[in-house]
Amino acid sequence: MDNFGTTNSFTFTHVFDNRDNYFNASKGRRISFAAQWGGHGLGGDYDFYKFTAEGRFYKALGNGHILALRLMGGYIDGDVSYGNLFDLGGSDTLRGYEDDQFKGKKMYAATLEYRFPIAKKVQGVLFTDAGSTWGIDEGKIPWYTDDDSLNWSVGVGIRLQTPIGPIRLDYGHGDRNKFNFSFGTQF
C-alpha cells in the first residue's frame, strides 16, 4: 500500500440533523451518509469508492442526565492510500487505544455515553467504545497485521463548557490505560 500519490475525489454527503444543541445535545439525532469516488479520470493515483454512514442519537433522561449513542460503519472498494483508510483509536473513536491504532477498508464502531451534571458548565461522562477495522490485503502494509476482532474500551470523562467550546478529558481502559485531552465535542 503506497502512501504517496495524489488523491482526487468527489464526495456526496447527506445529513439529517434535529439536535437541540450542536455542542451539547440532549435530544434529537444526526444521521449522515457519505459516498466518495476517486479515480484516475480525475487526475489522481487511486481508483476507489468509499461509503460511510453515521448515526448519533441523544435522549434526555431528566435533570441534566443524557444518554448518547453513536453508530458508524464504512466500506472502501478499490485502491486507496494509507491516509484514506478508515482508522479507529484515540480520543474520537476508541478511547484507551493509541491514535489511529486500527486501519482498514471496512469499519464499524459504536459509542455509548451516560452524561450527568457535576456543576454549572461541568459534566461527567461514563462511556464504552467498541469497533473494528479490517480488509487490508496481507502484506500491503509490512508492519501491520489485519485483524477483524472487536476492540472495546470503558472509561470516565469530564466536560467543561467554555465560551470557545467544550474541553474534554477522558480516561479510557482498552488495551492500554490512556488519558485523552481534546477540544470540541466527540459527538
Language-model segments: which ranges?
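Short, exposed beta-strand-loop hairpins at the edges of beta-sheets
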Residues: 170-173
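C-terminal outer-membrane beta-barrel translocator/porin domains of Gram-negative envelope proteins
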Residues: 1-118, 124-130, 134
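A short pocket-lining beta-strand/turn micro-motif at the edge of beta-sheets
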Residues: 106-108, 120-124, 150-154, 162-167, ...
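Outer-membrane beta-barrel "beta-signal"
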Residues: 11, 91, 156-162, 176-187
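C-terminal beta-signal and adjacent terminal beta-strands/loops
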Residues: 129-149, 175, 187
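Short small-residue beta-strand/loop micro-motif enriched in glycine and branched aliphatics
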Residues: 135-137, 165-168
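Secondary-structure boundary/capping motif
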Residues: 65-68, 114, 153, 178-182
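Short glycine-rich, acidic/polar surface loops and turns
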Residues: 111-113, 143-145, 153-158
